[in-house]
Each structure stands twice: as structure tokens, then as C-alpha cells.
Amino acid sequence: MDSEQISAGVTLAHTPPILTPTQLLAHWQGHRRLTRRLIKAFSEDQLYSYAVGGMRPFGALGWEMCAVTGYILTCLVSDTWPHPTWGEQPPHQTALLSAWDDLTARMDAELPTVPPARYSEVKPLFWGAQPAINAALYAIDNEIHHRGQGYVYLRSLGQSGPGLEVPPFWER
């Protein structure tokens, strides 16, 4: 969608949803469960130090995924869309997993409170005016993208194949 053609506060014409809010939450949490397993597949030192081709370490990517999802969840629930502030990256794997788990619980409790009509309302997202559903889909897409990077990192470390702890990408 061309953000110049959409104004904040506009609601798109009602069309039947492809996913219900409950299905969206289940889909999103399925991705999050798989990404959590991938975070755990890294050793502590590799999580925050190892990267390929100038990309960021997976610990930094994990924090970005957590921060983006937390920001979008807060926006969806509160219906306020300020410029994001990401906060400090957790310094250890256990801290990242704890923040991840706290956010998972928040999503389970708070996402069902978002009125379904809000998803079709155009909101002033920090990358341009878009329907609110685009924000949720962005968080999911961003996670899939970064999780793919994590798989590349683990494979380049030789952590792939039968008997290793790398979860298959289809097990969400």
C-alpha cells in the first residue's frame, strides 16, 4: 500500500478476516515458540558474538524481535502509536529468554483484548500510515527473517544434522 494515499484515522472497507484474532495469536505464538527454541540452541558466547557476513549476532536479532513485538503489542492494545524506543539489549541468554517469556505471557493476556475492528484501521506507524494488521504482520515477518539468519549461523557453526538441538523450521 502506498502510505501517501492512506491517512491515519481512516478505516478500510470491511472485508471478512482471513484469520480471527485467536488464530492470529496462535499463529504468532507458534513462530515465537520456534524462535525461542532457536535462541536456546546457541551457546551463551555464540549467541552474542557470532555472526556471518557482517550481520548482527543472533542475540541482538533476538532482542530486536522481542522489542519490535513488545512495541507493536503495546500499540495495538493502547491504540497509541508513538515512535519506538527499544531499550537495552539483555546481556545474557537467560535474560533474553526471560524477556521473551514475559512478552509471550503479555501477548496471551493482552492481544485478545484488541478490538478486531482496530486491525483494519489505518494507524500512523513509524514507517508510514498503514492498517494496524500490517504492524502485527511486520513483527511476524521480521521474526521469520531473523530466525532464518539464526539457522544460517548455526549451520555455519556446524550445528545441523540428526541428533543436534537445532529445531526444524517447520515445527512451529
PLM segments and residue spans:
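Soluble or luminal CAZymes and related metallo-dependent hydrolases
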Residues: T20, H27-H31, A99, L103
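Short, contiguous alpha-helical
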Residues: D2-A13, L25-I39, E44-W86, P124-R172
